[in-house]
From Swiss-Prot:
UniProt entry tagged with the keyword NAD: no
Active site residues according to the UniProt entry: K164
Gene behind this protein: rlmE
Protein name: Ribosomal RNA large subunit methyltransferase E
Location of the protein in the cell: Cytoplasm
Family indicated by similarity: Belongs to the class I-like SAM-binding methyltransferase superfamily. RNA methyltransferase RlmE family.
InterPro entries for the chain: RNA_methyltr_RlmE, RNA_MeTrfase_FtsJ_dom, rRNA-MeTfrase_E, rRNA_MeTrfase_gammaproteobac, SAM-dependent_MTases_sf
One annotated GO molecular function: rRNA (uridine-2'-O-)-methyltransferase activity
Keywords from the UniProt entry: Cytoplasm, Methyltransferase, rRNA processing, S-adenosyl-L-methionine, Transferase
Top-level taxon: Bacteria
EC number(s) stated in the UniProt entry for this protein: 2.1.1.166
Length: 208
């Protein structure tokens, strides 16, 4: 019975995925993923990126966000990206493969950032979902807390933080914490984010 349910669920997901207009557009444009469009929508509304910026990209693979951001920051900008999964090279992106939760990986990431502060920390990290909110939400909240901690360590005053969060237990407390650290905080649900998904994007600007 369980196998049939998983098979049906997987079939629905695949059908939805390959008929998704943003997936089709991404394939047509040669983009790494549909996530490119989510960040584009956020940039249109919140103007996070400017030429010459330094950015940290967490949960970067397969590279949709980094691929978009390099078009906004130009040749003088720099992106330090990290993911557990491999990612094909992108010009202007310094990629570190490893588990962000591992202290050695975190140390290596901070070494790549160096002494200079960054202007944007962005996180599209998500755990491997099992479909049970009581398990998935705490796993997700742990990752977004780590991303926020990273932003505290490396963001310059006035810097920005954008993070994918799955709504559920702990969301309001997390949002409150971010509001204490940034001058302006918005919760975005891009059109390119699937309607039935719990995901939203917190966009925080003006690091205090």
């Amino acid at each position: 019975m369980t196998g049939k349910k998983r098979s049906a669920s997987s079939s629905r997901w695949l059908q939805e995925h390959f008929s998704d207009k943003y997936v089709l557009q991404a394939q047509k444009k040669g983009l790494r993923s549909r996530a490119w469009f989510k960040l584009d929508e956020i940039q249109q509304s919140d103007k996070l990126f400017k030429p010459g910026m330094t950015i940290v990209d967490l949960g970067a693979a397969p590279g949709g966000w980094s691929q978009y951001a390099v078009t906004q920051i130009g040749g003088q900008g720099r992106i330090i990206a990290c993911d557990l999964l491999p990612m094909d090279p992108i010009v202007g992106v310094d990629f570190l493969q490893g588990d962000f939760r591992d202290e050695l990986v975190l140390k290596a990431l901070l070494e790549r950032v160096g002494d200079s502060k960054v202007q944007v920390v962005m996180s599209d990290m998500a755990p491997n979902m099992c479909g049970t909110p009581a398990v998935d939400i705490p796993r997700s909240m742990y990752l977004v807390e780590l991303a926020l901690e990273m932003s505290r360590d490396v963001l310059a005053p006035g810097g920005s933080f954008v993070v994918k969060v799955f709504q559920g237990e702990g969301f309001e407390e997390y949002l409150k914490e971010i509001r204490s650290l940034f001058a302006k905080v918005k919760v975005r649900k891009p059109d390119s984010s699937r309607a039935r998904s719990r995901e939203v994007y917190i966009v925080a600007t003006g690091r205090k």
